[in-house]
Curated annotation (Swiss-Prot):
SUPFAM superfamilies xrefs: omega toxin-like
GO CC annotations on file: extracellular region; host cell presynaptic membrane
Cross-referenced Pfam families: Toxin_7
Covalent S-S links between cysteines: 2-18, 9-23, 17-33, 25-31
A GO MF label: toxin activity
Function of the molecule: Insecticidal neurotoxin that induces an irreversible spastic paralysis when injected into insects. Modifies presynaptic voltage-gated sodium channels (Nav), causing them to open at the normal resting potential of the nerve. This leads to spontaneous release of neurotransmitter and repetitive action potentials in motor neurons.
Organism placement in taxonomy: Eukaryota, Metazoa, Ecdysozoa, Arthropoda, Chelicerata
Keywords: Amidation, Disulfide bond, Ion channel impairing toxin, Knottin, Neurotoxin, Presynaptic neurotoxin, Secreted, Toxin, Voltage-gated sodium channel impairing toxin
Modified residues (Asparagine amide): 37
InterPro entries hit by this protein: Beta/delta-agatoxin_fam
Annotated organism of origin: Agelenopsis aperta
Keyword Transferase attached: no
Name used for this protein in its record: Mu-agatoxin-Aa1e
Family as reported in the entry's similarity comment: Belongs to the neurotoxin 07 (Beta/delta-agtx) family. 03 (aga-4) subfamily. Aga sub-subfamily.
């Protein structure tokens, strides 16, 4: 399963972002998925 926009994710070990999203830890300690565009 993948997670979508603004959902919590992990760069190294799931949950991972769905296609079209990337994981950012800019909001450390919470990493979230953001749209690639």
């Amino acid at each position: 399963a993948c997670v979508g926009e603004n959902k919590q994710c992990a760069d190294w070990a799931g949950p991972h972002c769905c296609d079209g999203y990337y994981c950012t830890c800019r909001y450390f300690p919470k990493c979230i998925c953001r749209n690639n565009n």
